[in-house]
Amino acid sequence: MPHCGTTNSEINLNSNELISYQKKKSNEDLQKKHDKKCSINLKTSQVPDGGFNNQYTQLTANKIEQYNCNDLDKVCIVPSSRSDGMEASFSELLLSPNKLISQPWQTAEEIENWQNDSFRQRNEMFSCIYTNSMLNQQPCSQQQLLATQLLYARLLRSQLAEREFHSNKFNMVHYSGSKKTMLREDELLSTPSSQDNNNNIKLIKDIENSISCVDPPLFEFSNVHQRAEQKNKQDDKNCYSPKLKSNKEALDGYDLQHTCDFIREQKNILIDIKKKLDNLSDSSGKFRKRLSVRQSHIEVNNGSNSALEESVRRQLNGNRKSIENLLEEVKRLYNQWSSAELYYVRSLQRLGLPSEEDGEYTSTPTHTIMALAAIALSNESILPQKTNAVHSKIPDVESESDFFLTSAKPKTLVEIEDIILQLASSVNMHQSSSASTPHESYSDSVKSDCEESNSAPTCIWHSTRQTFRHKKDVEPCSTAAEIILEYASLSSSSNIETSRLLTSASNLTDVTENYNVTTQLPIVFNYNRESSAESIVTDPLLVPEFSTAPSTPSTGSNSGCSTGMVSGIFGLSQNRRKQRLARHIETLTTNSFKSNAIRGNVDNEITNQLKTSPSIRALPTENVSHLITKTLSSANASLTAQELSITNLFKERLCALQGNAGSMKTEIFPMIDAPYDLSIGSKTKHMNLEAKHTSNAQSNESKETTNDKKKPHIKKPLNAFMLYMKEMRAKVVAECTLKESAAINQILGRRWHELSREEQSKYYEKARQERQLHMELYPGWSARDNYGYVSKKKKRKKDRSTTDSGGNNMKKCRARFGLDQQSQWCKPCRRKKKCIRYMEALNGNGPAEDGSCFDEHGSQLSDDDEDDYDDDKLGGSCGSADETNKIEDEDSESLNQSMPSPGCLSGLSSLQSPSTTMSLASPLNMNANSATNVIFPASSNALLIVGADQPTAQQRPTLVSTSGSSSGSTSSISTTPNTSSTVSPVTCMTGPCLGSSQERAMMLGNRFSHLGMGLSPPVVSTSTSKSEPFFKPHPTVCNNPIFALPSIGNCSLNISSMPNTSRNPIGANPRDINNPLSINQLTKRREYKNVELIEASESKTIVAHAATSIIQHVAVNGYHANHSLLNSNLGHLHHQLNNRTENPNRSEQTMLSVSNHSVNSSECHKESDSQAIVSSNPPNAGSSDNGVISVS
């Protein structure tokens, strides 16, 4: 952009130029006629050369002037100071479409392509006109300024699609940014003053001048970038097939003395442009806001809409999007320049060269080459990846930029740096192995320079298909070959020490670890760069091939891109720090890079390397190496001169390197620009990973087993009584002095039964809510999960979902029949054992339902044996709310499952809930007829003698099977009509009875002996000739029969009235706490009454006196059996019975009625004695002759 002057002379000059162009508009028709005439005259007339040229120049100049005048008339509307003029220009400007503005430039495209001077004059004129208008409209309003700025915004965005098409077509790689979005390529200025588009010092001056001018941001932005675009175009035209010149000519082409300053200046310009674009966006937003406010005001007042304002609103919305796109483009360019600066600094660090910021900085050609390469690579990292079709169109020649763009992912900083180093090492490898057999990868693609003399290597940042012209007045551009030669010169002089370096490098590469370099920040280390930087970094034989892709098998030479993670000895000596997102790039083994690579074995080594390498070798690499080696082979003389000149610059460093070369065999070179890595070698790491994998598997298995064992214990939901206990326990503990749990539970149980139905219903509702919540929290939970054995649960995991076929078979008797149909339960269910039906359905081989089962020793138990076995287990105390001696059911029964009777319900644990039907446990009915004389021991505290008034010959055989409790509890006999037998598994079956009095005496003695020893009495069998019932019916008091003892001989026994032993009502389950029926009568205390002795006139009364004295003695002494007293009384009683029962014909009738005794203890009694309640069936006339009695 020219200097935007502010003096009057410059303003007048610009105005004169405008007037002169406007005057030439009148010659438009005349020039059209001359056009036709001149075309005819050129063929027929003889015109001198000078005249012809003048005429031709005049005609073309007139055409350009004509189009420029049209542009100025249609586009550049200079606002005037009058308000009418401002409104008119404002309206016309905003309503003019984009096509109308850009149409004149599109029609003049062909002429402007070859008229660069006129093209520059038009842009300069355009700039002067705009500057003049800006100076004249200082007192104008903000809307005028905004309108002009919006005009240029539309102008700049009009050709975006066309520019993108040209950019993609020619594969342009620009220094200052790809895809310039300001102006078309055909409109760019031609300034042949620069040899490169990034080292033009005049451009910097123009930028500084443009910043000093008070120009709008958009015009400044467009002017800066149109100059940059024109430089790119001029470089494209000037780029030619390079001839390798002498050292002086090569060094004179680089004049970037302050590369970092130049890059930073570009960044500053972009920052300034961004700020001004933001200001423009703010101004546009304010204008849109004011317009919307005015529009709403018009709609309210007039109810009409202005077409002009609607058009302005649409244009403003479009301009807003254009400004946003420009801001994104500026940000992208800024990031690109920032990347270029970073690449440049990092490259200097890796080469060990000082930067501009250091005090010892001296400009060298290497600095210039690194700067150019950094700018090109920064642009390459931002460009999108090209498709494979683009590469397939040009298989013969591949540019370096095409090689860069084949990576699937954006390259990191070190990857881009290593690309340059790999190319340099490829050149050196070709030089070092030129005397020997070349590389297999290179020999296939290398062609002689004579065969390809016409095909020139392409420029690193220019088109691959353009024809380059030779211009003597233009400095040559830097090409890829020149950049590679500069790097090759750095290591060419170090070939003398190659064998030593290979030996040390082979030692280093044995411990090479997989690494990936993702560090983006320049890190400077205070190592001695003088001794190991230059000649080692690019030595070809020390540099293996790397791949950016993971370790995958190779699918072909062109299946991917090997970006060449080559960093020489620095990439092999140390390990880089692995970032969290780093990909592990497997490093090739370096056994093939021994000294025999120089001695003619290069072919075999590279072949083996390619076979065992998991990396992917890419075709673009071969093409580039072919391109480089082909160029080098044709200019050995120029290359030698260039190498000698570059070697002089690093003479001191090479001397230091030669001095330290002897120690390289044993020393490990430090990593210059990479942090320290704490990882281990690849083999060790692989072994550790395998060991870690196995240990993890074992630990996971152990964790699973421990998790199974440590599963949380889920408690059952509390029932109504437990909720009541939880609520009232604290109160009872506070009232009672005793803190024993059993006593407190007795009190709570008694109080629970004293509650009314309404009071209990509250807790039943709470229990229902508790169950519902438990089901929601733990779906699928079962009580088996807590109480079932883990091994059994694992072996048989049943499906809890019931099916139509066998769903009912998986239920137990309690869930299948309910509490009201206990007669249909199996025997184990009535005894709170495992259900036979359930076990059969679960296993298929359970016990049969006929009542027989197996004990723990495997022997089959009959009904009688099973009753005895169960009775022994149920003989314990039940004073607490939880039956500790009871095995829990393992099924998920109904949540209203009953609990054992709490509190002081002594003896209730041996009772089964009554029913209207006879229990299956006692299938025999009681007969009410008179029975024979039977001495019936009930427990260790009481003796029952049952007599019969029938003769012995008429007595029927009976079998009495009893099982007494080992605890010191009092048993009783009671007959209650319409009640079932007790739960105590005692049954009486028919059998032979003892017919003689001697046998009866023996039975009585045996009972007393067992009673004294605290043992269960054995089975006693008595036989008679005739079957008679045990008891004789008598009138009842409160539904309880009173046994009236018949006369003994000629005397009679007077028996006191028995207490009222009322049973719970029909349908009430005394063991079911959740049953709302009142069972408080079961908790009533009963007092023990002394046994009244009945005087008898006959000699048989001695037996009753003896038995009664024993019972009284035992009861008074706290229910403890006195062995000595029992033994003495037994002997006396046995002797008397033997003497007085010799006459078998006498009718002996003796009946001793022992009343029930209840312990009158307090609520907090220390001992909880179990009480046994014996119930018998009522007399039935039509019942069978068999009888049953149950005693515990």
From Swiss-Prot:
- Region entry Disordered: which residue ranges? 691-713, 790-812, 847-916, 955-986, 1136-1192
Where is the signal peptide, in residue numbers?
A: none
Q: What does the record give as the DNA-binding region?
A: 714-782
User: Which biological process annotations from GO are given for this protein?
Assistant: canonical Wnt signaling pathway; cell elongation involved in imaginal disc-derived wing morphogenesis; chitin-based larval cuticle pattern formation; digestive tract morphogenesis; embryonic pattern specification; heart development; imaginal disc-derived wing morphogenesis; mesodermal cell fate determination
Cellular component terms (Gene Ontology): beta-catenin-TCF complex; chromatin; nucleus; transcription regulator complex
Where does the protein end up?
Nucleus
Q: What is the name attached to this protein's record?
A: Protein pangolin, isoform J
Q: Which organism is it from?
A: Drosophila melanogaster (Fruit fly)
Q: Taxonomically, what lineage is the organism? A: Eukaryota, Metazoa, Ecdysozoa, Arthropoda, Hexapoda
